[in-house]
């Protein structure tokens, strides 16, 4: 007789510890039911991982599942698993019916990540019970302290439960109690207990593996040969002895008055199930944990290899009741040897939870990889060429993130991922895309279109302006919608030229400020509100203004008072630099006619790709962040962003995100945007390159230079976007990456402790102007016909010692010579930001880079104060700063105050410079006199000469 089939006569059911789609679909499960009498199936994450990762049989189902819309990795896996469980349950249903619900079950496990969360375990188990919708389902719940109350609750709801990760006799007693109490509650609520089944899954071979290891240690240390023999005799005996004693406990628990009362109502006993019965020690019989654990009302769930082995040479007998006294003696002997079985089983539960979580990580990684393959055109591609040293560091850090569940904890808003301060209060951006009200944006967009505005102007700074600027530059003017402009400057020329570029009578203004207290958008609003009032009348002016702000801000009050057309509210838990995928970016996008439904749909693909269920090696945002952070720790802290022509403005947004998030506490990453790519010889060993382009922008020359950098040992990340419509994916990728990099660096990426310092200085200066009508006097260290030079006493002394004297060139030469390996030079120009000035600053910076071999920044103030200014003041002291100010050819008054735009800009420049010098930065200010174009040309030539 078939030995497997013979187990039926001894009261034991055989379940199969294996499941795969083809295995069920091809009739193999049905064959085992018919030939071997298999009466159930168990599954776990490891089983599913092997099935999905090691074959292509799930490729088509994954593709079909995603045809109806993208799914998160966990959702996608669950859909596959539920289908597999349903199919297996249907095959086993005749067994279930024939045996009146005593057998014929398929087990599906709740997420191992929930093993220490009672409420979440209950919620998931109840949901899976409903999703599968089969009476012969058993939901697997671990026998952790948090799992026990969940078991009782679920049994009390009439859900059949397979209790897993059971090692200890004591815990088994608690498991049985949870089952009995749950049955009593179910009965009391009017339920029929005959519909409920449960098994208590004792993990067997893992006990021997753990105990044998400790016995081997004892044997190695023992000197007495008799003691060595006694200890050796215990090897391979403990797991079976423990199981036999548990079975004796089972017989006691499921007898007597309490059980009789439940049984009379149709309750079934909670059978002991022997799990982990594949033999791990090759010195033991491959059917040891089957042959020695045969008994009435038990289940043995076996892997296919063990099933085949038992069918081939197994022998069935009533072994579970044999040698009970010997089993007691074996356990007693172990205790006398100084080995605590209780301690071992407690540790095995902890290890089991971790092993199951590890298996789930591998499973979700496999599903994520398959999903990415199916969606290949829908998700922007990323490749990392990091070199050996950095690559190993990223791999090690990634493994730490996986083991410590930091991705899930990040999404759960666990501040301990970072510094444990207030990070949990600033993570609303994680879900802002999913919560976007597309219908409302679409309705608003249509109202804008009907009003035939010629222009739309965003008045904002930092996160309120840079994201909209990227969108405006990337998408351009859309047919039927206004042209989107951004104003983020107090420079009078920039304000005037913006005004000249629009038709003020047919322009809508978006005043964007989270706090409502930011100086620049407030004075810009005051200026343009007055201009609109002049153009269309004061009573109608408010109808041309919108506000985007946080609830309760001062801007909300002003907007209400002045009759703004609408107020859009942001989420107070989203910081400005993370707000582009919230109303601060989406309102300007909608105003400009960008297809938000498409933008959000495409962005959500990246959100899901970076989700809590995607392990580090398959998570693009986390991978980028780990690489950025690890590179920073290795001294490669100059994150050099290379953006192709179609997305050329992306770096302006990314540099704020990176600098303001990481540049603090004396450390951080310094973003380098807009530097023209060159040969390896001009770069130091502090670079980390990120290259972004759309896939239709071929540039062989650029690619050749990138390859040369890679071959020279520089880390290079390549990101290829499907099209500009995927820009939202890059916003989210970089947000996740920056948050992760902050954690790797050990800083809080959501505060900006040094930004306020410059604001305070500026307010002090403008307050003085309001009182006296002039800014406090300042004395240059050198004054020439074309420029004045300013710095503090410490910098002046150092520069004079280095050769600075009475001419501009000597000061520039001494100042730029202070830059060395690992430094960067930042040009901070408080002038109009236009193409000509951008080109001139570019000439200056490239000359510095090529001669000094240092990273360079070219920034315009006051714009950069809300962007990279945080890193310049609070980050590493590796910056050499050249501030450029100039006489304004004209000025513009700000309605309602003495200080003009020019005065405010001057105060901002002075406040910024004062804070830089107070922080001990190497800083020099050059104030150009007279005509700005001539002054910039002179300065450019002076810099070129100073470098030679």
Identify the function of each model-found stretch.
Residues 1-27, 397:
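N- or domain-start disorder-to-order transition segments that initiate the globular core
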Residues 446-614, 688, 692-695, 704-711, ...:
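Glycine-rich phosphate-binding loops that contact phosphosugars or nucleotide phosphates
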Residues 376-450, 728-730, 741-744, 770-815, ...:
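Extended, charge-enriched "interface" segments that sit outside catalytic cores
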Residues 47-150:
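Active-site beta->alpha loop and helix N-cap motifs at the rims of alpha/beta catalytic domains
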Residues 534-689, 698-699, 736-850:
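Active-site phosphate/pyrophosphate-binding segments
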Residues 159-305:
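Catalytic alpha/beta core domains of metabolic enzymes, predominantly
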Residues 267-371:
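Flexible, acidic glycine-rich loops studded with aromatic residues
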Residues 44, 108, 139, 154, ...:
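Conserved, mostly hydrophobic/aromatic
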């Amino acid at each position: 007789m078939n030995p497997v089939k013979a187990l039926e006569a001894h009261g034991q059911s055989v379940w199969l510890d294996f499941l795969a789609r083809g295995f069920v679909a091809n009739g193999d499960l049905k064959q085992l039911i018919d030939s071997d009498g298999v009466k159930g199936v168990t599954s776990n994450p490891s089983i599913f991982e092997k099935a999905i990762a090691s074959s292509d049989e799930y490729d088509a189902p994954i593709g079909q599942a995603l045809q109806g819309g993208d799914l998160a990795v966990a959702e996608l896996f669950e859909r596959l698993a539920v289908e597999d469980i349903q199919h297996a349950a249907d095959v086993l249903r005749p067994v279930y019916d024939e045996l009146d619900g005593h057998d014929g079950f398929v087990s599906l496990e709740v997420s191992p990540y929930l093993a220490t969360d009672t409420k979440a375990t209950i919620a998931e188990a109840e949901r899976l019970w409903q999703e599968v919708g089969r009476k012969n389902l058993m939901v697997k719940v671990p026998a952790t302290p948090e799992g026990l109350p969940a078991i009782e609750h679920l049994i009390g709801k009439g859900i059949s439960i397979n209790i897993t990760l059971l090692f200890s006799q004591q815990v088994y007693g608690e498991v049985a109690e949870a089952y009995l109490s749950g049955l009593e509650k179910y009965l009391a609520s009017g339920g029929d207990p005959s519909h409920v089944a449960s098994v208590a899954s004792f993990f067997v071979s893992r006990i021997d593996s753990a105990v044998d290891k400790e016995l081997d240690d004892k044997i190695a240390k023992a000197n007495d040969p008799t003691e060595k023999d006694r200890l050796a005799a215990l090897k391979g005996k403990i797991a079976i002895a423990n199981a036999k004693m548990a079975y004796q406990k089972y017989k006691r628990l499921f007898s007597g008055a309490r059980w009789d009362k439940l049984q009379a109502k149709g309750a079934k006993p909670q059978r002991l199930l022997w799990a982990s019965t594949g033999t791990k020690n090759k010195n033991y019989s491959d059917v040891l944990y089957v042959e020695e654990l045969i008994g009435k009302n038990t289940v043995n769930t076996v892997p296919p290899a063990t099933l085949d082995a038992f069918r081939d040479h197994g022998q069935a007998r009533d072994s579970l009741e044999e040698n009970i006294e010997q089993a007691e003696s074996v356990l007693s002997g172990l205790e006398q040897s100084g080995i605590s079985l209780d301690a071992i089983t407690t540790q095995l539960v902890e290890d089991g939870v971790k092993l199951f979580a590890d298996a789930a990580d591998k499973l979700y990684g496999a599903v994520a990889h398959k999903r990415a393959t199916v969606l290949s055109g829908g998700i922007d591609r990323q490749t990392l060429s990091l070199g050996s040293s950095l690559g190993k560091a990223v791999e090690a850090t990634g493994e730490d993130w996986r083991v410590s569940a930091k991705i899930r904890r990040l999404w759960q808003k666990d501040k301990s991922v970072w510094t444990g301060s207030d990070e949990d209060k600033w993570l609303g951006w994680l879900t802002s895309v999913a919560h976007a009200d597309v219908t409302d944006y679409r309705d608003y967009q249509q109202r804008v279109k009907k009003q035939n505005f010629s222009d739309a102007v965003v008045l904002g700074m930092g996160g309120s302006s840079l994201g909209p600027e990227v969108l405006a530059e990337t998408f351009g003017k859309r047919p039927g919608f206004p042209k989107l402009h951004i104003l983020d400057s107090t420079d009078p020329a920039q304000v005037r030229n913006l005004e000249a570029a629009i038709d003020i009578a047919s322009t809508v203004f978006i005043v964007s400020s989270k706090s409502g207290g930011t100086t620049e958008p407030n004075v810009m609003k005051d200026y343009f509100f007055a201009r609109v009032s002049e153009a269309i009348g004061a009573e109608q002016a408010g109808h041309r203004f919108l506000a985007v702000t946080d609830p309760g801000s001062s801007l909300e009050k002003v907007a209400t008072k002045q009759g703004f057309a609408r107020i859009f509210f942001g989420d107070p838990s989203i910081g400005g630099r993370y707000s582009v995928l919230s109303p601060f970016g989406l309102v300007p996008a909608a105003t400009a006619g960008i297809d938000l439904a498409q933008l959000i749909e495409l962005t959500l693909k990246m959100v899901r790709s970076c989700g809590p269920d995607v392990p580090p090696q398959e998570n693009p945002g986390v991978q980028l962040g780990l690489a950025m952070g690890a590179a920073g720790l290795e001294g490669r802290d100059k994150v050099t962003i290379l953006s192709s022509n179609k997305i050329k403005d992306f770096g302006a947004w990314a540099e704020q995100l990176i600098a303001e998030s990481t540049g603090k506490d004396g450390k951080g990453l310094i973003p380098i945007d807009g530097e023209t790519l060159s040969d390896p010889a001009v770069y130091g060993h502090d670079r980390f390159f990120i290259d972004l382009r759309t896939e239709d922008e071929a540039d062989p020359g650029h690619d050749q230079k990138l390859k040369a950098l890679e071959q020279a040992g520089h880390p290079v990340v390549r990101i290829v976007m499907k099209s500009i419509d995927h820009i939202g994916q890059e916003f989210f990728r970089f947000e996740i990456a920056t948050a992760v990099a902050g954690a790797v660096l050990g800083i809080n990426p959501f505060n900006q402790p040094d930004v306020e310092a410059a604001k305070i200085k500026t307010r002090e200066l403008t307050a003085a102007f309001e009182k006296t009508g002039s800014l406090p006097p300042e004395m240059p260290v050198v004054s020439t016909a074309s420029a004045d030079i300013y710095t503090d006493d410490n910098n002046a002394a150092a520069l004079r010692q280095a050769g600075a004297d009475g001419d501009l060139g000597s000061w520039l030469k001494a100042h730029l010579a202070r830059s060395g390996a690992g430094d960067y030079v930042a040009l901070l120009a408080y002038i109009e930001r236009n193409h000509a000035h951008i080109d001139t600053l570019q000439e200056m910076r490239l000359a510095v880079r090529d001669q000094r071999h240092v990273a360079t920044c070219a920034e315009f103030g006051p714009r950069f104060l809300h962007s990279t200014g945080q890193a310049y003041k609070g980050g590493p002291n590796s910056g050499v700063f050249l501030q450029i100010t100039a006489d304004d050819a004209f000025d513009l008054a700000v309605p309602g105050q003495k200080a003009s735009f020019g005065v405010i800009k001057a105060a901002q420049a002075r406040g910024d410079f004062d804070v830089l010098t107070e922080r001990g930065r190497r800083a020099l200010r050059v104030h150009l006199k007279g005509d700005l174009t001539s002054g910039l040309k002179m300065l450019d030539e002076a810099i070129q000469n100073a470098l030679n």
